[in-house]
Regions:
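N-terminal metal-binding scaffold of metallo-dependent hydrolase/deaminase domains
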Residues: 1-49
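C-terminal cap of metal-dependent C-N hydrolases
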Residues: 15, 383-433
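Metal-coordinating catalytic core of metallo-dependent amide/deamination hydrolases
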Residues: 141-273
Length: 433
């Protein structure tokens, strides 16, 4: 890959409390796909990138367009795309039994799975999501195909073959040995630690995993030093159920921790709507990341996650669409919904300020991106995951660059995203079929 310099209006967040803004700025990207430097003019870029040889790089001028970090979806169920926007009048547990599990059972058919996965990934591409933390299904072959499709597309993903062996339909229930064997196959095939697409250990949630399966998942994560994803404290009835199933655990989070699934390797837990007390302290101590899924939490009547409080406590946070509990794959909408949830919290407790735009943008980009490594910023050494936004149709002339970005986040859509990059490579439109 040839080293390049991109010229545009560049905006990103090194820190959560402010934007870095370079009007008509330049960002240099090395042949390894990483940012070498960012500056307001070429002379400053030359000083900053003394070893880069600016003169030999191709300069790509995006004119009056915005250049921002790409989006990261930190919690999404790819096999639920067919149910997107359906059964939104149910709470979590009946929604799982009546809609989600029957749909996921269809993924035993790899042809059906590929058709749905292509549709899912194309939508992600449209909305500028270049990295994802993804639930597959229990089916090894279908999960393998999903990982292959991400590789073919040039989009980054941590993809999990789901582990579950209780409180689920027979078609989705597999014994411990089969669950581990399927994961071992995928680890062998996609185990490159520097690969864009890698496995992530994925016990669905405590109610669907016996202690034996949870223990095996923890051992697998430790053996291969793989990340872990699951769900935590999403719904009050779910929390009560976990307390019945795991009476020796001090909290829902402790139920994972006892089996080596709560920060012993990099861990992300979706929702955490009701996380508090000892569970919160354990999460902070172990460095567990929260995937905040505002649309899903509203749709399934789960509650409002206290993201301002978690942020102030130093908890790592990213945003997730949680399709199909959530109804929208546009991650820019998640920024808006997360701010709105924060404002609802503010109405209940004026001691906590609601989230502002720089904070939520930082959460969605640099904070979320840290789960993949150095992703989500244009600081030197970061992988160049980026979007080019042509907001001319939104009449930008009267606005500052920050207001242009804010306006795009609130009222723009995929039609304004004209270029997408992942690890320095431009990502072409993936085939639907």
């Amino acid at each position: 890959m040839m080293k390049k310099i991109y010229k545009a209006h560049i905006l990103f967040t090194k820190e959560k409390d402010r934007f870095e803004v370079y009007e008509n700025g330049y960002v240099a990207v090395g042949d390894d796909g990483r940012v070498v430097g960012v500056a307001s003019n070429l002379d400053d870029l030359k000083v900053q990138c003394s070893k880069f040889n600016v003169q030999s790089a191709e300069i790509v001028d995006f004119g009056d367009k915005l250049l921002i970090p790409a989006m990261n979806d930190m919690h999404v169920h790819a096999p639920q795309v067919h149910n997107q926007g359906v059964a939104m009048d149910l709470e979590l547990l009946p929604w799982l039994q009546n809609y989600t599990f029957p749909e996921e059972s269809k993924y035993a058919d790899v042809e059906y799975a590929e058709r749905m996965y292509r549709r899912f990934m194309h939508t992600q591409w449209l909305f500028g999501t270049m990295r994802s933390v993804v639930f597959g299904t229990v089916h090894t072959a279908s999960t393998r195909r999903l990982m292959q499709l991400y590789q073919e597309a040039g989009m980054g993903a941590l993809v999990g073959k789901v582990a579950m062996n209780r409180n689920c339909p027979e078609a989705l229930c597999e014994d411990v040995e089969a669950a581990i064997e399927g994961n071992e196959q995928l680890i062998a095939e996609f185990g490159d630690r520097d690969g864009l697409v890698r496995p992530i250990i994925t016990p669905r949630f405590v109610p669907s995993c016996t202690p034996e399966l949870l223990k095996a998942c923890g051992e697998l994560a430790n053996k291969y030093q793989l990340p872990v994803q699951s769900h935590l404290s999403e719904n009050v009835s779910e929390i009560a159920w976990v307390a019945e199933l795991e009476p020796e655990s001090k909290s829902y989070g402790d139920a994972y921790n006892r089996y080596g699934l709560f920060g012993q390797t990099p861990t992300i837990m979706a929702h955490c709507v009701w996380t508090q007390g000892a569970e919160l302290e354990l999460m902070k101590r172990n460095g567990v990341m929260v995937a905040h899924c505002p649309t899903s939490n509203f749709n399934l009547s789960s509650g409002m996650a206290p993201i301002r409080s978690l942020l102030d406590e130093g908890v790592r946070i990213g945003l997730g669409s949680d399709i199909s509990g959530g109804h929208d794959l546009n991650m820019f909408r998640m920024l808006v919904y997360a701010i709105q949830v924060s404002k609802m919290h503010y109405q209940l407790n004026h001691d906590k300020a609601f989230l502002n735009l720089s904070e939520i943008f930082w959460i969605a980009t640099k904070s979320a991106g840290s789960f993949f490594g150095k992703v989500g910023s244009f600081e030197p050494g970061y992988e160049f995951d980026a979007l080019v936004i042509d907001d001319a149709v939104l009449y930008p002339a009267e606005y500052s660059l920050l207001h242009r970005l804010e306006r795009f986040i609130y009222v723009g859509d995929d039609r304004q995203i004209v270029h997408r990059f992942c690890r320095g490579q431009e990502v072409p439109e993936p085939k639907v079929f």
